[in-house]
Amino acid sequence: MGRSADNPLKDAFTSLGNVTVLFLDTLRSIFAKRFRVRDLVEQLHFIGVKSQSVVLLTGAFTGMVMCAQFYIQFHKVKMDSAVMSVVTVAMARELGAVLTSLMIAGRVGAAMAAQLGTMKVTEQIDALRTLATSPVDYLVAPRLLAMLISLPLLTAEAIAISMVSGMLVAVYLLGLDPVFLWSNMVFYTGSVDIWMGLIKAFIFAGIIATIACHKGMHCGQGAEGVGKATTEAVVAASITILVSNFFVTLILNKLLIYQN
């Protein structure tokens, strides 16, 4: 049995350290503006524009399902008009950022790991170093910056479409009064709720891009190595999102909500 199998905890902390170092190096590259704007635009198009269908479907059907489920419970206590306020707050604070990030991790994170993994296997990354070009500047920085820009916007889009779809279900399928639904939704939903979701999305964006790029740049040899790196990138990013969401929620609740 190999040493890596004997020390899974050590390997986990080593990977965490390597990912952290890559993230810090990439931040320095971004602030120093050592990336190419053309690469940034390409990544913005790939992450933001081409993820529209995934985000819209996720937000729309999540809003509809939550509205239909919450209505059953609220109807029992004669609080039908509060259905949409709960849906909106839940999406704004938690589900919007988490679900959108998980979908982007599966779609974009896998693609990033596969792209960089293929470049690693075909020795293109080594060629960049030979040409005195930093792989972090050329490959990682535009991907991380594009993710940091795109994911909060996609999350806001998912929250908005969930509100619209939930309202449509509440009004046209459940027969609720749109005026009361809207007034309750506006009253119980504040800017703090929206900011919580956007801050989480910003944090999750850094997690997805950094882990995906790290896994791709350190993949094994051959097609098997690329496939393994792609799978590990999605799994690691998804688990990290779910775990970090708990701690980020505690911190943001303390800073944004309990102080008000």
Regions found by a protein language model. Give the residues of each.
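Selective transmembrane-helix segments that form parts of the transport pathway or gating/packing helices
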Residues: 48, 52, 56, 95, ...
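Short, membrane-interfacial amphipathic segments enriched in basic
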Residues: 1-40, 215-220
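Short cytoplasmic-facing helical segments at TM-TM junctions of multi-pass membrane proteins
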Residues: 116-141, 222-226
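Hydrophobic alpha-helical transmembrane segments that constitute the membrane-spanning cores
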Residues: 58-61, 141-170, 203, 211, ...
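Final/C-terminal transmembrane alpha-helix of multipass membrane proteins
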Residues: 226, 234-250
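Membrane-interfacial helix-loop-helix connectors in multipass membrane proteins
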Residues: 69-92, 160-202, 211-232, 251-260
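Hydrophobic alpha-helical transmembrane segments of multi-pass membrane transport proteins
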Residues: 83-126, 211
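Active-site cofactor/substrate anionic-group-binding motifs, chiefly glycine-
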Residues: 47-99, 103
